[in-house]
């Protein structure tokens, strides 16, 4: 791929979860070539990584035009992040609020590292657009999901690599119900069903039971949010966070 193709190509941070799967569909609907990037950082719910190829294959099979646009997949070993993170995302510990008010599922520096590595790969591959599922509506207070963080990171990456990357975050200002709605707008019931069955959200990595909203334990914060979002999507309502 040459630099002149960069404006019509994108690299999507694709974990295998609902949000990043929706972002992948969003990118496939807009760009001529879309590559994907995943990270193994020792996450407790690494079953999500096992969902990545299944979802990619299902999307390509179900939506042939998107399949023609779907490019290479990249998987990066980022185990160093897990080794320095004492969080409920990387350790078998109970999920609770930490002393700083953030949930202990927050992995410090995760999205900063993800985007920096994504930019390095995009630079080498001649890709201009980086797409991530960060969201400031359903973000549990994670500071590296904020719009200000992404805007600052875009500036830093462009200065540091003398490039003109564009960081796209299509979910930034929408809730989980609207994320389901966006999936429906992009690919109808077929895409919604693929996301429901083929993606993974549960922090505990539970994939034994298929609920109406997808697989999961049904009790962790991620499952509860996904469940409320799906139910609100079906009813046409917005998701309201509990007090």
From Swiss-Prot:
One of its GO terms (molecular function) is zinc ion binding. Its EC number is 6.3.4.20. HAMAP family: QueC. Pfam families: QueC (PF06508). It comes from the Bacteria. It catalyses: 7-carboxy-7-deazaguanine + NH4(+) + ATP = 7-cyano-7-deazaguanine + ADP + phosphate + H2O + H(+). This is 7-cyano-7-deazaguanine synthase. Belongs to the QueC family.
């Amino acid at each position: 791929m040459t630099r002149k193709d960069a404006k019509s190509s994108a690299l999507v941070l694709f974990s295998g979860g609902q949000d990043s799967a929706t972002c992948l569909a969003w990118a496939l609907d807009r760009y001529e070539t879309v590559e994907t990037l995943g990270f193994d950082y020792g996450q407790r719910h690494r079953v999500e990584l096992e969902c990545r190829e299944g979802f990619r294959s299902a999307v390509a099979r179900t939506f042939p035009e998107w399949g023609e646009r779907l490019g290479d997949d990249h998987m990066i070993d980022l185990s160093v992040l897990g080794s320095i993170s004492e969080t409920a995302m990387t350790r078998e510990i109970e999920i609770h609020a930490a002393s700083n008010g953030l949930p202990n599922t927050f992995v410090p520096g995760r999205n900063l590292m993800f985007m920096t590595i994504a930019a390095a790969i995009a630079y080498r591959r001649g890709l201009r657009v980086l797409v991530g599922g960060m969201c400031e509506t359903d973000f549990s207070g994670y500071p590296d999901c904020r719009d200000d963080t992404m805007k600052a990171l875009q500036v830093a990456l462009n200065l540091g690599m003398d490039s003109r990357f564009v960081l796209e975050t299509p979910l930034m200002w929408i809730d989980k119900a609207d994320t389901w709605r966006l999936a429906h707008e992009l690919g109808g019931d077929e895409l919604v069903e693929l996301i429901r069955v083929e993606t993974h959200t549960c922090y505990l990595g539970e994939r034994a039971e298929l609920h109406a909203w997808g697989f999961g334990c049904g009790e962790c914060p991620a499952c509860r949010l996904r469940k409320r979002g799906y139910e609100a999507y079906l009813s046409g309502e917005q998701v309201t966070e509990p007090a």
